[in-house]
Amino acid sequence: MAMNMSMTLCMFVMVVVAATVIDSTQLQEPDLSRMRRSGPADCCRMKECCTDRVNECLQRYSGREDKFVSFCYQEATVTCGSFNEIVGCCYGYQMCMIRVVKPNSLSGAHEACKTVSCGNPCA
């Protein structure tokens, strides 16, 4: 009987301590919005950010640019924001780069594709 009383008392103390800790911890509303962190987003700024970030990322993969377009596009979407999960930051640019970029031809492909419409809802 003493063992059961001891266990009950121990559990009661643990619950009280847990409730006190949880109650005293300030809950913060996380600001996860990339749009708010980066300032007001508009189509032109998002496109410029996206194309610049993809280009910078692909420069790290010299000679293998054609293999890393999708990877770099996803990385840019995380950095620049996206209109939705499907479109990303500039879908038209990604599709153009996939078609045009060849190993060691990044600057020409970037120049050719950066003027392509993104296909975004407000582009």
Swiss-Prot record:
Superkingdom assignment: Eukaryota
Disulfide bonds: 49-80, 50-89, 57-72, 90-118, 96-113
GO cellular component: extracellular region; host cell postsynaptic membrane
A GO molecular-function descriptor: toxin activity
Cited Gene3D superfamilies: 1.20.120.1800
Signal peptide (residue range): 1-18
Principal location: secreted
Subcellular location: Secreted
Tissue: Expressed by the venom duct.
Site description Interaction with glutamate receptor 2 (GRIA2), residues in chain: 74, 85, 112
Residues passing through the membrane, by range: none
Keywords of the record: Disulfide bond, Ion channel impairing toxin, Ionotropic glutamate receptor inhibitor, Neurotoxin, Postsynaptic neurotoxin, Secreted, Signal, Toxin
Positions annotated as propeptide: 19-37
Function: Potently and selectively blocks the desensitization of ionotropic glutamate AMPA receptors (GRIA1, GRIA2, GRIA3 and GRIA4). Binds to a different site than does the drug cyclothiazide. The toxin acts like a straitjacket on the 'gating ring' of the ligand-binding domain (LBD) of the receptor. It does so by restraining the domains via both intra- and interdimer cross-links such that agonist-induced closure of the LBD 'clamshells' is transduced into an irislike expansion of the gating ring.
Assembly description: Homodimer; disulfide-linked.
Miscellaneous note of the record: Ikot-ikot is a Filipino word that translates to 'spinning around' or 'turning around', a reference to the swimming phenotype observed in fish injected with the toxin.
Domain notes: The cysteine framework is CC-CC-C-C-C-CC-C-C-C-C.
Official protein name in the record: Con-ikot-ikot
